[in-house]
From Swiss-Prot:
Keywords on record: Cytoplasm, Glycolysis, Lyase, Magnesium, Metal-binding, Secreted
Reactions catalysed according to its record: (2R)-2-phosphoglycerate = phosphoenolpyruvate + H2O
Positions annotated to bind (2R)-2-phosphoglycerate: 163, 339, 368-369, 390
Gene Ontology terms, MF aspect: magnesium ion binding; phosphopyruvate hydratase activity
Cofactor: Mg(2+)
Enzyme class, broadest EC rank: lyase
Cofactor binding summary note: Binds a second Mg(2+) ion via substrate during catalysis.
Keyword Aminoacyl-tRNA synthetase: no
Pathway recorded for this protein: Carbohydrate degradation; glycolysis; pyruvate from D-glyceraldehyde 3-phosphate: step 4/5
Function: Catalyzes the reversible conversion of 2-phosphoglycerate (2-PG) into phosphoenolpyruvate (PEP). It is essential for the degradation of carbohydrates via glycolysis.
Residues reported to bind Mg(2+): 242, 287, 314
Protein's UniProt name: Enolase
Length: 430
């Protein structure tokens, strides 16, 4: 039978060498699920709370034994006897056990680990792939990868202010080809950087992290790498950016301090800058172009660029239906970044994706900078037919694990697999 007989959590390490939570769920039938929780470096002010121990003598205060104990001592006894396939009821119970708006009592890292492990155990019990369990028989869309190949900001120790510069192989015929294109461009970029005498060490998300003369130079260099790899920028491959601008926004003067360039800009000047960049380069997506609390700035950006550029809310919406509803009502952005640990349960994650789709917003399924070998987000991308996934460069096992899982899923789906390329941007006037 699919009844839960044990839930167990332990402290393990993520891709940055920091502790995170791993949860295992066991059932009477022998079905089993394991999940590992990711962690972010640049985090939104309104994200669900990730519990850290604060004991400076253990992992510099970043231990997660409190969250682990919350699973083992509080959550586990409540879940014994539950039917593992009752995801909605279990997630509801987890939310009620915590009882706070931001999951600050038990910790989103504790709650999410359980939520994901339960889903994996249920899929194991039913002997079906996770994406099919989560999404049903119509789960068949492979996502366009948003591949972070130049890292800056909080993800790298360099002078680049913009956190991520990405490529999107929209001209590929299928996911396999998209991944090949991305990998070839990645290697081409390494060659270009070497020729320029620049550093080819990689950052948290597997992309290169060189010191560059300006943020725009990153775009120029990537275009050069795309062409060197034999692809057409703007036609076969589009560019995307994650500014993560809350990281360089100064609350005291209300301006954006681009320290790498020694420039200070107002909201309106930032919008002008993005408009200039999108006119010069084939940029199809900008994430968190302005601070998470700069709603007027986001509204202006949407008015100016929203019909031709995907404007993704990450820190702005934090995978939260209340924040997203506010954005939809006020005409802010046209896309939401989906990070499971920003909200804490699979049910709430899927609610945010559904709300976005109903409003004509796209949903981009995303990793965190502190990742693990867990590939659940790959299955979520296919389960929800989201059409886009952001999970780093084709480098580092913690990133490649997601891409390899998508290759497996594409193989399993065979001729029913779909890859929509540029049509994934249904929020734009293409």
């Amino acid at each position: 039978m699919p009844y839960i007989v044990d839930v167990y959590a332990r402290e393990v390490l993520d891709s940055r060498g920091n502790p995170t939570v791993e949860v295992e769920v066991y059932t009477e039938s022998g079905a089993f699920g394991r999940a590992l929780v990711p962690s972010g470096a640049s985090t939104g002010e309104y994200e669900a709370v990730e519990l850290r121990d604060g004991d400076k003598d253990r992992y510099l205060g970043k231990g997660v034994l409190t969250a682990v104990n919350n699973v083992n001592e509080i959550i586990a006894p409540e879940l014994i006897g539950f039917d593992v396939t009752e995801q909605v009821s279990i997630d509801k119970l987890l939310i009620e056990l915590d009882g706070t708006e931001n999951k600050g009592k038990l910790g989103a890292n504790a709650i999410l680990g359980v939520s994901m492990a339960v889903a994996r155990a249920a899929a194991d019990f039913l002997q079906i792939p996770l994406y099919q369990y989560l999404g049903g028989f119509n789960s068949k869309t492979l996502p366009v990868p948003m591949m972070n190949i130049v890292n800056g900001g909080e993800h790298a120790d360099n002078n680049v202010d913009i956190q991520e510069f990405m490529i999107m192989p929209v001209g590929a015929e299928n996911f396999r080809e998209a991944l090949r294109m991305g990998a070839q461009i990645f290697h081409s970029l390494k060659s270009v950087l070497k020729e320029k005498g620049l550093n080819t060490a990689v950052g948290d998300e597997g992309g290169f992290a060189p010191n560059l003369g300006s943020n725009e130079e990153a775009l120029q260099t990537i275009v050069e790498a795309i062409e060197k790899a034999g692809f057409k920028p703007g036609e076969e491959v589009k560019l995307a950016m994650d500014a993560a601008s809350s990281e360089f926004y100064n609350k005291e003067d209300g301006k954006y301090h681009l320290a790498g360039e020694g420039v200070v800009k107002t909201s309106a000047e930032m919008v002008d800058w993005y408009e200039e960049l999108t006119s010069k380069y084939p940029i199809i997506s900008i994430e968190d172009g302005l601070d998470e609390n700069d709603w007027e700035g986001h509204k202006l950006l949407t008015e100016r660029l929203g019909s031709k550029v995907q404007l993704v809310g990450d820190d702005l919406f934090v995978t939260n239906t209340k924040k997203l509803a506010e954005g939809i009502k006020n005409g802010v952005g046209n896309s939401i970044l989906i990070k499971v640990n920003q909200i804490g349960t699979l049910t709430e994650t899927f609610d945010a994706i559904e709300m976005a789709k109903r409003a004509g917003y796209t949903a981009v399924i995303s990793h965190r900078s502190g990742e693990t070998e867990d590939s659940t987000i790959a299955d979520i991308a296919v389960a929800t037919n989201a059409g886009q996934i952001k999970t780093g460069a084709p480098s580092r096992t913690d990133r490649v694990a997601k891409y390899n899982q998508l290759l497996r899923i594409e193989d399993q789906l065979a001729e029913t697999a779909q890859y929509h390329g540029i049509q994934s941007f249904y929020n734009l006037n293409k």
